[in-house]
């Protein structure tokens, strides 16, 4: 009699606040900043963006970037995220400061962000 192995799905579910503050690096292991916020699409029940804080010094002058969640890969060993973008390219990415957030419900803005990171919008 053949023995079968039952595969068990183990969801990767974590509290959102455990991800804020996590480091983001690129494939060259350059530090790109840290995750400040997770933006939730309430209508679709999913994370739309991770807000990345980059640049500045001791939290002053940081620029914020909305990174499509699908553009980030999890490195569970190092407890960090990997974003496939060169550090110099990130400097020219569409960003904002902590006092002037974009309208993330604006589809023109959102499409531009997903295009910049070469990621297909999840609503398409």
What are the functions of these language-model segments?
Residues 1-124:
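Peripheral interaction segments used for macromolecular assembly
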């Amino acid at each position: 009699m053949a023995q079968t192995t039952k595969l068990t799905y183990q969801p990767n579910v974590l509290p959102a606040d455990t991800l804020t503050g996590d480091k983001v690096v690129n494939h060259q292991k350059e530090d790109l900043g840290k995750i400040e916020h997770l933006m939730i699409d309430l209508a679709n029940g999913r994370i739309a963006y991770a807000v990345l804080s980059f640049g500045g010094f001791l939290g002053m002058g940081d620029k914020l970037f909305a990174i499509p969640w699908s553009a980030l890969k999890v490195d569970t060993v190092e407890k960090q995220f990997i974003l496939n973008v060169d550090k110099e390219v990130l400097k020219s990415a569409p960003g904002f400061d902590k006092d002037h957030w974009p309208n993330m419900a604006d589809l023109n803005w959102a499409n531009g962000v997903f295009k910049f990171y070469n990621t297909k919008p999840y609503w398409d």
